[in-house]
A protein has these predicted regions:
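Active-site-adjacent loops and short helices of periplasmic peptidoglycan-processing enzymes
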Residues: 1-131, 135-144
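Domain-terminus/edge residues, biased toward the C-terminal soluble/receptor-binding domains
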Residues: 111-112, 125-188
Length: 188
């Protein structure tokens, strides 16, 4: 998709609906940034954040207050599922309310084929189409934090007096192959 000229360059089944995995985290970031009212918020990784679906792990320490900005960084750079769940709990609403906000935002953006059931993308029930994801990417371009974090090759996450090194899950970003406006990988 060419954002400059607002046109499709090439497509194959652009409206086909399928699971979107961690691309979900772009919506999580948008909803968090728009709804969090506490600039100094912190959250801890807890047992509630455990990945019972795929058994993924986190490099972040459990039961340690971590700033929401650092969790956002861990989520967008390293695609940390636990950070996504912790962020959804820290935006001043329940996890279920947060997911409802994600679905409301999708409808607001005209993403008719999109449904979210969790904030990390672990569930195969998070579905969308390529054309809907173009709408999400275009919307995400308005958030400098999302653009900057999704394009970082690596980062240090400050967590409880520790500095945790993480790499971007996107090899094209890590190796600086090209410069894209917004990046996010997803794997089912």
């Amino acid at each position: 998709y060419d954002f400059t000229h607002d046109r499709v360059l090439e497509s194959s089944s652009p409206n086909h609906v399928q699971p979107i995995a961690s691309v979900t985290k772009l919506m999580t970031a948008n909803v968090f940034l728009e709804n969090n009212r506490n600039a100094n918020c912190t959250a801890s990784i807890t047992d509630d954040d455990y990945d019972y679906i795929k058994g993924t792990h986190t490099k972040l320490p459990k039961y340690t207050p971590i700033s929401c900005n650092e969790l956002l960084k861990a989520m967008l750079v390293h695609s940390d599922n636990y950070a996504a769940h912790a962020l959804s709990r820290s935006a001043g609403m329940s996890r279920l309310q947060f997911i409802q906000k994600m679905n409301e935002k999708a409808r607001e953006l005209g993403m008719r084929s999109t449904r979210f059931s969790d904030s990390s993308g672990l569930s195969d029930s998070n579905i969308s189409s390529a054309m809907d994801l173009v709408k999400l990417a275009k919307y995400s371009l308005n958030k400098t934090q999302i653009k900057n974090l999704s394009n970082m090759p690596n980062a240090f996450i400050q967590a409880g007096g520790r500095s945790v090194f993480v790499k971007n899950t996107n090899k094209l970003v890590r190796e600086e192959v090209f410069d894209a406006a917004v990046n996010k990988t997803g794997y089912i």
